[in-house]
């Protein structure tokens, strides 16, 4: 019996041991190990995406030589665990300082294109150029220049014609640049807003304000109606007051339009930095988190809307967006309470992150603005965040990860439990000083978050996460072209249902590419879902485009889904342009463990069979001996 027990213990250890093809490396900190990424120290990270369609993230960088920038990409080699340069499609910018960078397939030809905002070093003017990749010449061609543009443009698939558009500010107006099969068209932003001025009473008051930053501008479903909304950070050029605008997506005249109600316009305190959108408390509604500048505090704005849902219904079928007509009298729901800072009160809204006030948020506004990066590092299904702090005494910067913790609220929340962050639940990286930007990466492509640091010396550094988490994960991506992994949609929503260990069911939410217009954001294309220790499958997984013409085409449901895997989903418009076709590929990860686990199971079963055979033979031998001893007196 002891031997059998030992075999089961050994088998359990084999199944739960964390295997890695990376050897133990020096510079361990909180279970993270640094290793060389093979990227030169004169290169700056610009963007993460999958260049070569191998289902792994690559990195686009800008390498400086004197006043010239060479934009190139490094392909991740998962076997060697390094990046290898692909120098065949370089783009050289002469006398240009890059301010903003976006990579995607803009003209829908399955080749990657760039939108680059830069300062011309000869004239100090800001322009934005669109570079389209020409597959015949195997090079990038500058197709359009937005002259004297604001640097804060962003990309979203607004409207009803299934195409990425560039939203920018120029000559006192918000404008939209869109691509057709033959040309590039510039439209006024007003073409995309609702004509119902009774309900949308803020449309004509704020639609021409400049943008504060593209990092905060987002295209995502804020009210849970399965249609994406525009979230815009703006300012009044006359008063310099900052605002948050939430333009709700609606159907009007068989088109998608955007409606700005006056009670979804929020004035922002100048002490608030660039906000991040995420679901803090995992109630399937998106919240907003602001860093408070020159402090170590954050402001959490919880979404006031809640999900009304029965587990047997189709969520999007029962949560449809508004359809407005000229006579519509519906009201637009208020999404947030006013954003009020109380720096002297560490309540659940204004959260002090560190004990020592000498540590404040690091904000390199000209190059890498302060931005909180949220992902679930410990896979407990709640988002944690990564940022950099500056020590006013030592003049050095340090990355820190803050883990989400459960907090009980007062009676104003009717006893509900929300999430916040604690000074005592952190990963610190004090040995990594003078870091400019820190962000998440997934080197092993297994849903477990690794890190990339970019330091003051211009070195891009990789940290491999060797912590072991006893939980499940899921990753998914929605593409608008088949097997084109840089053709990812912005702001796609993934809702999924699981059952907790205690038997209660819950709906969770994650989004892909919520905010990634400025290079300082450096976010991954996938939506990463930490499932925690729920049941071993996702009962209902619904992916929502948020941009398609009719609500019935807007989403697709899959059930059940295996965790520790990735869903690759794409939709195409049928030839008759009346129906959207969806396709899904399920990739079970991590594949590197599979052969070892299968071998372990075979060995374990073989050992158990041999051991059982041995016990059976031993028992027969003992029975024979006992029988001989029993019948010996009679048979001599």
How would you label these PLM feature ranges?
Residues 411-439, 444-636:
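Gly/Ser/Thr/Pro-enriched helix-cap/hinge segments flanking short amphipathic alpha-helices
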Residues 124, 130-131, 135-281, 288-294, ...:
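Solenoidal tandem-repeat scaffolds enriched in leucines and small polar residues
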Residues 2-16:
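Cleavable N-terminal signal peptides of Sec/SRP-targeted secreted and luminal proteins
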């Amino acid at each position: 019996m002891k031997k059998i027990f030992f075999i089961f213990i050994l088998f359990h250890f084999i199944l739960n041991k964390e295997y890695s093809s990376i050897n133990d490396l020096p510079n361990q900190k909180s279970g993270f190990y640094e290793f060389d990424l093979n990227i030169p120290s004169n290169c700056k990270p610009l963007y993460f995406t999958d260049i070569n369609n191998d289902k792994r993230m690559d990195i686009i960088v800008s390498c400086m030589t004197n006043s010239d920038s060479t934009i190139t990409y490094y392909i991740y080699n998962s076997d060697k665990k390094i990046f290898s340069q692909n120098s065949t499609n370089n783009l050289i910018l002469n006398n240009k300082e890059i301010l903003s960078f976006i990579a995607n397939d803009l003209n829908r030809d399955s080749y990657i294109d760039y939108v680059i905002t830069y300062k011309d070093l000869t004239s100090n003017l800001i322009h934005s150029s669109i570079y389209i990749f020409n597959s015949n010449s195997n090079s990038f061609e500058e197709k359009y220049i937005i002259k004297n543009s604001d640097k804060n443009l962003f990309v979203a698939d607004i409207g009803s014609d299934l195409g990425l558009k560039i939203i920018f500010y120029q000559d006192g107006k918000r404008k939209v640049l869109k691509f057709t099969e033959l040309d590039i068209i510039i439209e006024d932003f007003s073409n995309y807003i609702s004509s119902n001025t009774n309900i949308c009473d803020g449309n004509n008051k704020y639609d021409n304000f400049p943008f504060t930053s593209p990092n905060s501008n987002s295209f995502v479903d804020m009210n849970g109606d399965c249609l994406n909304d525009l979230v815009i950070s703006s300012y009044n050029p006359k008063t310099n007051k900052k605002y948050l605008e939430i333009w709700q997506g609606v159907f009007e005249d068989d088109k998608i339009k955007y409606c700005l109600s006056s009670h979804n316009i929020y004035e922002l305190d100048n002490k608030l930095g660039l906000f991040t959108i995420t679901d803090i408390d995992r109630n399937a509604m998106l919240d907003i988190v602001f860093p408070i500048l020159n402090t170590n505090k954050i402001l959490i704005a919880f979404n006031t809307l809640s999900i009304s849902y029965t587990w047997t219904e189709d969520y999007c079928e029962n949560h449809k967006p508004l359809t407005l007509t000229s006579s519509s009298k519906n009201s637009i729901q208020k999404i947030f309470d006013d954003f009020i800072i109380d720096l002297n009160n560490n309540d659940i809204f204004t959260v002090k992150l560190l004990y020592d006030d000498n540590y404040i948020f690091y904000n390199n506004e000209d190059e890498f603005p302060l931005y909180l990066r949220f992902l679930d590092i410990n896979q407990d299904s709640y988002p944690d965040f990564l940022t950099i702090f500056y020590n006013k005494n030592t003049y050095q910067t340090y990355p820190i990860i803050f883990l989400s913790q459960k907090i009980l609220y007062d009676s104003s929340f009717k006893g509900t439990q929300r999430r916040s962050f604690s000074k005592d639940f952190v990963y610190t990286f004090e040995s990594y000083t003078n870091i400019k930007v820190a962000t998440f990466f997934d080197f092993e492509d297994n849903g477990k978050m690794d890190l990339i640091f970019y330091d003051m010396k211009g070195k891009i550094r990789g940290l491999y996460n060797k912590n072991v988490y006893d939980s499940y994960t899921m990753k998914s991506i929605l593409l608008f072209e088949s097997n084109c992994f840089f053709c990812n949609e912005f702001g796609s929503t993934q809702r999924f249902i699981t059952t907790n260990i205690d038997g209660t069911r819950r709906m969770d939410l994650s989004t892909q590419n919520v905010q990634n217009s400025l290079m300082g954001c450096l976010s991954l294309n996938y939506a990463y879902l930490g499932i925690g220790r729920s049941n071993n499958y996702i009962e209902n997984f619904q992916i929502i485009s948020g941009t398609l013409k009719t609500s019935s085409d807007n989403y697709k449901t899959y059930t059940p889904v295996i965790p520790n895997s990735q869903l690759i989903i794409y939709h195409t418009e049928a030839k008759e342009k009346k129906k959207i076709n969806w396709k899904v590929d399920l990739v079970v990860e991590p594949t590197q463990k599979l052969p070892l686990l299968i071998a372990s199971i075979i060995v374990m079963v073989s050992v158990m069979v041999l051991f059982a055979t041995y016990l059976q033979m031993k028992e027969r031998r003992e029975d024979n001996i006992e029988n001989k001893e029993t019948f010996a007196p009679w048979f001599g």
